[in-house]
């Protein structure tokens, strides 16, 4: 009997269904009992994930291949912490408003930790923990929100196809073509 091969992504990306608590958004918010969500289930919702070498992102061949194959031509960094982000508390609260984008949201955590919350097909929140070395892609049109954890720090590489566009459309924006396409591709057709 062989051991099951462990997916290295699970060391830097984990997901679970959230409780309904109104406590601090930076807490894990596990249900009781805990209800974990597989990375395969996230992929069914269009959320892609990788484990990369965050200590060597400048020379990481895996990152280079991903960028080339997906057309990510622009890159910058965003540090979310009280010392680096003006109006920190206001910004963190705004990131936590449920919203969507008309383009993919690509985030590669090179330091710290963050939570990306996404909706499943039944509108339940799934919390996605991304640690150093984890990279996720949220598809265009998915409703989501973001927060740091209780350490109040993440440094993330932001990747874009072409010039950076980061326009949040707070819910509801179901009329946008990106939302309709997301629903068709991941909510309706996938559940049929």
From Swiss-Prot:
Name its GO BP terms in alphabetical order. Answer: L-methionine salvage from methylthioadenosine; regulation of cell division
Task: Identify which cofactors the protein needs according to its UniProt entry.
Answer: Fe(2+); Ni(2+)
Q: What is its EC number?
A: 1.13.11.54, 1.13.11.53
Q: What class of enzyme is it?
A: oxidoreductase
Keywords attached to this entry:
Amino-acid biosynthesis, Cytoplasm, Dioxygenase, Iron, Metal-binding, Methionine biosynthesis, Nickel, Nucleus, Oxidoreductase
Its UniProt entry gives the catalysed reaction(s) as: 1,2-dihydroxy-5-(methylsulfanyl)pent-1-en-3-one + O2 = 4-methylsulfanyl-2-oxobutanoate + formate + 2 H(+); 1,2-dihydroxy-5-(methylsulfanyl)pent-1-en-3-one + O2 = 3-(methylsulfanyl)propanoate + CO + formate + 2 H(+)
Spell out the molecular function terms from Gene Ontology: acireductone dioxygenase (Ni2+-requiring) activity; acireductone dioxygenase [iron(II)-requiring] activity; iron ion binding; nickel cation binding
Query: Is Cell cycle among this UniProt entry's keywords?
Result: no
Q: In which pathway does it act?
A: Amino-acid biosynthesis; L-methionine biosynthesis via salvage pathway; L-methionine from S-methyl-5-thio-alpha-D-ribose 1-phosphate: step 5/6
- Cross-referenced InterPro entries: ARD, ARD_euk, RmlC-like_jellyroll, RmlC_Cupin_sf
So where does Fe(2+) get bound? 99, 101, 105, 144
Q: Which PANTHER family match?
A: ACIREDUCTONE DIOXYGENASE (PTHR23418:SF0)
Name under which the protein is recorded: Acireductone dioxygenase 2
């Amino acid at each position: 009997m062989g051991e099951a091969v462990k997916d290295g992504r699970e060391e830097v990306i984990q997901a679970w269904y959230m409780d309904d608590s109104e406590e601090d958004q930076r807490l894990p918010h596990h249900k009781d009992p805990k209800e974990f969500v597989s990375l395969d289930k996230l992929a069914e919702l269009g959320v892609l994930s990788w484990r990369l070498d965050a200590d060597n992102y400048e020379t990481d061949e895996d990152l280079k291949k991903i960028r080339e194959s997906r057309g990510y031509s622009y890159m910058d960094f965003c540090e979310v912490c009280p010392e680096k982000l003006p109006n920190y508390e206001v910004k963190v609260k705004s990131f936590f408003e449920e919203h969507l984008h008309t383009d993919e949201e690509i985030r590669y955590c090179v330091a710290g930790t963050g939570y990306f919350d996404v909706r499943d097909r039944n509108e339940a929140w799934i919390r996605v923990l991304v640690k150093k070395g984890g990279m996720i892609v949220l598809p265009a049109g998915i409703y989501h929100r973001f927060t740091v954890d209780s350490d109040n720090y993440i440094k993330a590489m932001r990747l874009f196809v072409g010039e950076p566009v980061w326009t949040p459309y707070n819910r509801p924006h179901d009329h946008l073509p990106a939302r309709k396409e997301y629903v068709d591709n991941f909510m309706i057709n996938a559940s049929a």
